[in-house]
């Protein structure tokens, strides 16, 4: 046991001496200074944020041009579509396609004249209504 005691004393004394060397006297804490607040203002000019709204006029001659109109709507531009120079069946297909596009982007489509439609994305609000010629006199029929 003498050997074990010597090892224990040797290791315990060494550990004790290490602790004494690491001990430091307490220092006075520095006074906490208040944080400086930035003098930035969070004001942004509305003119720099708001882009000028655009309205696109479209007069498709073939059904394939409906995709270009849909691209304008996806770019958040309002589109007035004149379908007077296209065959009636193709005009119906274009209106169906644009109705789906407008629904998908959360917009609106309104008929503003005979075969003339206003398609708007969700960022454009339309107020008011336009009555078509003789609309009040006869029962409503699908164009």
Swiss-Prot record:
Major site of localization recorded for this protein: cytoplasm
UniProt keywords, alphabetically: Cell cycle, Cell division, Cytoplasm, Septation
GO cellular component terms, A-Z: cytoplasm
Gene3D superfamilies reported in the protein's UniProt record: SepF-like protein (3.30.110.150)
Domain of life: Bacteria
Subcellular location: Cytoplasm
InterPro entries: Cell_div_SepF, Cell_div_SepF/SepF-rel, SepF-like_sf
Record carries keyword Cell division: yes
Presence of the UniProt keyword NADP in the record: no
Gene Ontology BP, a term: division septum assembly
Function: Cell division protein that is part of the divisome complex and is recruited early to the Z-ring. Probably stimulates Z-ring formation, perhaps through the cross-linking of FtsZ protofilaments. Its function overlaps with FtsA.
Oligomeric form and interacting partners: Homodimer. Interacts with FtsZ.
Family: Belongs to the SepF family.
Protein name per its UniProtKB record: Cell division protein SepF
Organism: Geobacillus thermodenitrificans (strain NG80-2)
Gene: sepF
